[in-house]
Amino acid sequence: KSPVTVAQFRTFVETTAYKTEAEKFGDSGVFNLEKQNWELMPGAFWQKPFGGAGNDAENNHPVTHVSWNDAVAYTNWAGKRLPTEAEWEFAARSGKNSENKFSWGNEISLDGKYFANTWQGELKTPEVKDGYLYTSPVGTFGENEAGLTDMGGNVWQWCADTYKAYPGSTAPIREDPNVKTIRSGSFFYDQYGEDSYSVSGRSMNSHETSLFNTGFRCAMDSK
């Protein structure tokens, strides 16, 4: 229904003694708003999104600083799996052949009410009209018609797939099995703007990468 939360990931770690790749590397990706650049923040990992001196991650927020490999380890433990990119988009469209731009409709906001945790303003001048500069509790902005939350904004979400060009696309994409697809967009600025939060928005990252705006959700085969 929702992205995996900090509390859920903690249960996994406490049960298995799992160490994330961010913990093994000793750092993870955080954007420094003051310096306006990405940094490998020492001590940043799923419990400390902004490094050792920062606040603890909140239990009901989506877990972040997890790589694709970490996400797969969790899903294997939980008896689930990562969704394929096609499954993710099908779910974002509530299982319909919907023409809506976003999982909830066609507008990011209406009469001052935001439908997702998304970036507003320029990179140098962030605005917090939706109430959250960084992650928000899962489900804060409600469900789509399929009963799923956070299918646009809050955190990018790992998919099972290697990132590939769509059939018929002329985009010069070199397939690399270590580069995986991410969906949903996040709370953070994206060069593609609103399109990153759309049901068709997509991006990619290497399977070892962990960032302060990337998490995951689980899928299961129907019985």
Locate each region found by the language model.
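Short, structured active-site-proximal loop/turn typified by the sulfatase FGly-forming signature C/S-X-P-X-R
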Residues: 13-19
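Short, solvent-exposed alpha-helical surface patches in non-cytosolic proteins
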Residues: 1-13, 67-73, 89
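Functional-site microenvironments in short loops/helix caps that host divalent-cation chemistry
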Residues: 19, 24-200, 207, 212
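Short, structured beta-strand segments at or near domain termini in extracellular proteins/domains
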Residues: 212-223
